[in-house]
Amino acid sequence: KIVALDGNLDQVVESSWFIRKIGLPFNTFYVKEFAGVDPSSGNALYYKNTEDENGNLDRTLTQDVNEAQAVPYKQVDPKISGGLTNILSYKWFDLAFTLSYSLGGYSFDKTGTYIETDGASEGNRNLPIYELDRWQKPGDITDIPRFVLGRSDKVSGGSSRFVHSTDHLRLKNLTFGFTLPHNWTDKVLLDKVRVYFSGSNLLTWAKWKQYDPEVPVSGEVFCETPPMRTFSFGVEVNF
């Protein structure tokens, strides 16, 4: 957490969606709080979050993003992260794997501010697959507002709508091997022969599945390439 800032400052707002404030984690988002979609109109809803003289926030909903006040919201750094590596063997077989995990962190989807404007500026851009779940008729329950191509009321980029969890569990590495028995290798004058298969980034269980949870740079995602999934096969021979 931040314990002091330069001079007499108690907070500094950086870029469009970060705040440095005494008492808060260093990488804290500062955004207008998205409250879902109005089932009757399909418009985005926001909490006003205006502060009264006692410091209480007004949690009234509004469809006008300009009436909403940005507030500190979530943090980039996970509360818990780590990994587990295990090596198992039985007779001629061996198995090694590494799991990595992260819990409690968030990222800002900067790419989303370009491709999720609900029709305001998507004319020449690809849409994310989850736009298929957008609001389409009264009564629809979804968190994707209605799509109106060429709409004039552009979506606010500095909204918690674009803040997503980076919670995940990943099978980072896996190697499975088989060592030929000595009574086989002795016949061909070899000391050891091991055949193995290896892979990396094979499986990922993530709370937010639209981009890789390890991709964010300094809490932001902007078209970065995710870690590659790789496979390899090999033979080890000792004479």
State the predicted function of each range:
Residues 80-95, 180-182, 236-239:
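Surface-exposed extracellular loop regions of Gram-negative outer-membrane beta-barrel proteins
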Residues 59, 76-80, 87, 168-170, ...:
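Conserved structured core elements
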Residues 3-8, 134-239:
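Membrane-interface anchoring segments and C-terminal beta-barrel signals
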Residues 37, 91, 102, 181, ...:
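Residue-level marker of positions within ordered structural domains that often coincide
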Residues 72-73, 82-85, 183-184, 221-222:
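Generic recognition of flexible, low-complexity loop/linker segments
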Residues 1-77, 85, 94-165:
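Surface-exposed, extracytoplasmic segments of Gram-negative outer-membrane nutrient-acquisition systems
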